[in-house]
A protein has these predicted regions:
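N-terminal low-complexity, Ser/Thr- and acidic-residue-enriched intrinsically disordered segments
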Residues: 2-87, 91
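Active-site nucleotide/adenylate-binding loops and adjacent lid/helix of ATP-dependent enzymes
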Residues: 89-109, 129-134, 259, 264-275, ...
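Catalytic core of tubulin tyrosine ligase-like
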Residues: 142, 334-477
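Fold-independent oxyanion-binding glycine-rich loops
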Residues: 152-153, 168-169, 229-230, 280-282, ...
Length: 774
């Protein structure tokens, strides 16, 4: 399909990762391209489709931002990997290990003795005016004494073929989960050649990554968690992925508090100590008490807990200072001062504008330099949030211009050269820094360097490191012994997660009930047409009671319910399967696309049935696949409570003395009990059979009594609140509900206090929320 002599156009003299200037393949690519030549267009499309489908099924996405609106988009995989020889990779790894050691020493100086400023090695203004240098942390030594545990670096190859470090990702490095998913997806595209070639595996690195976290809490005397900004953050997929992969709690700032100098998580079991926090928020937002006072992402008092060495933060707060572009002008000299070595991997040639010697040169060479804010952390060719307007010239950096190397991208059924950068990851281990033998490459959508941004249509590729050794055999098996106890964080349920699971159960059940009522109404509308019918009037009144009568009303109500369920589910994606999330996501999309097209009658009934099946699929997946931890119990509590409340609403109307003909059949249909009606009552729907099936039957999962007993059972299974009075209040409320429900046997159903039972159940819901969710 392709050879070195085909029309693969290089961009001038810019180095290409696949093809050398003489037209031959680089050694790392030769075997892969021999394989590629044998693939035809149809085979290629089929393979690429498998990789893309895997990513969709796994729920891998990124957030796209446009005009203030963020949307989820499919992960843009460049299906061809980038291949590098192990020898070249080793050179890069050695350089980055040295750089990681240098950055650690800089952190210790910046927040310690500050000798580099005192000795004139760096300008005081570059540190003192840096917004990421957090003064309250000066003099603070982290628990374990190390500041940095996990790093990422962006690299690019310049015109001469040398690799340059474009950015140090220290504050909250992202991308490692995407790198792993890229690997899985790409091996689905090219399973045969991947197995045939000797490609370095990623599993050993992730094993060491896991051990790094375990080593930070060897006594296993507390929890470990990821501190995330929440679902609207562009990296949220990765946060949930890593939480599930490493067995960490997924936490937001409001999930934490500080008690007597100790960081604790608010859980349904009470306050539990947190020993390790992998933060995915910028340091300035971590503690509104001492840092950014209007932050809603952090936890007041966190710095106090760090001072008492009660918690380890990965990476240390304040490490964002190392990402500033200004240090690229000083790192070569600082490496000599601190490590007594030459810097192995250099940045782009950079100068601080405050250097008088450079200012005298600049006017003659200004076309050779890119000018940017000194404290920016973006790649030099990316759009910057910082403006140069009004900035002190001493706070500006000049860097040499760069043309990135290119790599193959498959577009319009042919390979074309596109600019690329490389992201590499490092983790601290007891034996020193370990470099992941892979990573990901960002591929441009055009020949411009800034087109590598995902926001501009860039794509992402897996990176294969070709070796002459047999691939490592390594299984990420679960740890044993005491460490396994540390990883059972899925049993620890944050209060906020319990709240969201409870309401997820309620929203999905309410949506199920509304869809059933709408379907029943439109089925009868198709039967009776425009002729007035008391049963149609009855179903209309029920729809009005649910707020979904007019077409635009039921569209907005269903969209609201689906959106609310999505919002709750997005907060707890680490608590249930990808399949469950994808079904809910598809249901939300289908409601928004199908509901506006719905017409009255049979057409509507058919479309509503399709939506109802999606809703039932989610409930089935959760019921069958979700582990019976506390989270499942709170979700089930919400589901059972909402099912009772819905039954009470429509039975109050359909069992009334003035209910129209056909009301009993409608009640049975809404209760999804037609089959059992036929098997037990010969299909005869009357008040007796309806009450038996939908109120009293302890074996019918749709009946009120079945779900009330379920409520009682679930309440016994969730942790008891330490406040015995609150427990007693909930017990008394359920006892009142039981008394009201049993009163039917004495007084019949005509005088049954539907409203009293509904109101008492809502009181129980409020008590549950107050006890566990605040």
């Amino acid at each position: 399909m392709f050879s070195a002599n085909d029309t693969y156009l290089l961009q001038g003299q810019t180095p290409d990762e696949m093809v050398q200037l003489d037209g031959s393949f680089r050694p790392a690519w030769a075997e892969f391209m021999e394989y590629w030549k044998k693939l035809d267009t149809e085979d290629t499309a089929t393979r690429f489709s498998k990789g893309s489908q895997y990513l969709r099924d796994a729920g891998v996405f990124y957030r796209h931002y446009s005009e203030g609106v963020s949307t989820e988009r499919d992960w843009p995989l460049n299906h061809l990997p980038v291949l590098l020889e192990e020898e070249e990779w080793t050179t890069l790894s050695d350089g980055l290990v040295q750089r990681a050691s240098l950055l650690e020493l800089l952190m210790k100086d910046f927040y310690g003795a500050n000798r580099l400023v005192q000795e004139g090695k760096i300008p005081a203004a570059c540190l003192a005016q840096n917004p990421e240098w957090l003064r309250p942390l000066v003099g603070l030594t982290p628990r374990g004494e190390d500041f940095l545990y996990y790093l990422a670096f962006d690299l690019g190859r310049d015109e001469s073929g040398r690799w340059r470090v474009l950015a140090d990702r220290v504050q909250a490095p992202s991308g490692i989960a995407f790198a792993l998913e890229n690997r899985v997806a790409t091996t689905r595209v090219f399973p045969d050649i991947f197995q045939k070639m000797s490609i370095r595996r990623l599993a050993p690195f992730f094993g060491k990554f896991r051990k790094m976290f375990q080593g930070l809490n060897p006594a296993a005397d507390g929890l470990m968690g990821i501190l995330t900004p929440g679902p609207m953050n562009e990296g949220y997929f990765e946060h949930t992925y890593i939480a599930r992969f490493l067995g960490l709690m997924l936490l937001e700032g409001e999930d934490l508090t500080v008690q007597e100098g100790q960081l604790v998580a608010k859980t349904v079991d009470g306050l539990l100590p947190l020993r390790v926090v992998w933060r995915r928020i910028d340091g300035i937002y971590a503690d509104p008490l001492e840092l950014k006072e209007n932050s809603r992402l952090g936890t007041p008092g966190l710095l106090g807990a760090i001072r008492k060495q009660e918690v380890t933060v990965v990476n240390a707060l304040g490490s964002g200072v190392l990402e500033s572009r200004v240090w690229s002008a000083f790192l070569p000299e600082l490496c000599k001062v601190l490590l007594h070595e030459e810097l192995k991997l250099t940045n782009l040639q950079s100068f601080w504008w405050g250097d008088p010697e450079f200012q005298s040169r600049f006017s003659d060479e200004k076309d050779d330099w890119m000018i940017s804010p000194a404290f920016s952390s973006n790649l030099v060719f990316e759009k910057d949030d910082h403006s140069l307007t009004g900035i002190d010239h001493s706070m500006v950096v000049a860097q040499e211009r760069l043309s990135l190397s290119t790599t193959p991208a498959y577009r319009h059924q042919k390979l074309s050269a596109a600019p690329m950068t490389l992201r590499m990851f490092l983790v601290r281990t007891p034996d020193g820094w370990e470099v992941m033998p892979g990573g990901f490459a960002r591929i441009g959508s055009s020949d411009q360097a800034d087109s590598i941004s995902l926001q501009k249509g860039g794509t992402v590729a897996d990176v294969w490191v070709k070796t002459n050794k047999p691939p490592e055999t390594y299984v990420l098996s679960p740890p044993s012994g005491a460490v396994a106890d540390q990883l059972r964080h899925s049993e620890v349920l944050p209060s906020r997660a319990a709240d969201n699971l409870y309401w997820l159960g309620r929203y999905v059940e309410r949506m199920d009930g509304v869809l059933r009522l709408l379907r029943a109404h439109h089925t009868r509308l198709a039967e009776f047409g425009t002729v007035y019918n008391p049963l149609l009037h009855c179903s209309e009144s029920l729809l009005q009671k649910f707020g979904v009568w007019e077409t635009d009303c039921f569209q907005s109500q269903l969209s609201f319910l689906a959106g609310s369920a999505m919002q709750s589910a997005s907060q707890v994606k680490d608590r249930f399967s990808y399949d469950g999330w994808m079904v809910l996501r598809e249901l939300d999309k289908e409601i928004k696309s199908e509901i506006p097209q719905i017409l009255s009658g049979d057409s509507a009934a058919s479309q509503l049935s399709s939506l109802l099946r999606q809703c039932s699929a989610f409930s089935g997946l959760v019921h069958e696949n979700m582990y019976r931890f506390k989270g499942w119990r709170f979700l089930s509590l919400g589901r059972s409570l909402e099912r009772i409340l819905l039954k009470l609403q429509y039975l109050e109307v359909l069992l009334s003395q003035n209910a129209p003909e056909g009301a009993m059949e409608l009640a049975i249909e809404l209760g999804d009990s037609q089959m059992v009606l036929h098997s037990r009552y010969w299909g005869i729907a009357n008040s007796s059979s309806v009450v038996d099936l939908l109120v009293d039957d302890v074996k019918n999962p749709r009946s009120i009594r079945f779900n009330f007993l379920k409520l009682q059972e679930l309440l016994l299974e969730i942790p008891k609140i330490k406040n015995s009075e609150i427990n007693a209040e909930m017990d008394r409320t359920l006892k009142d509900c039981r008394t009201i429900l049993n009163s039917r046997k004495r007084s019949g159903f005509n005088d049954f206090p539907f409203s009293d039972l509904s109101n008492t159940l809502r009181i129980f819901s409020d008590q549950l929320s107050s006890a566990y969710f605040h």
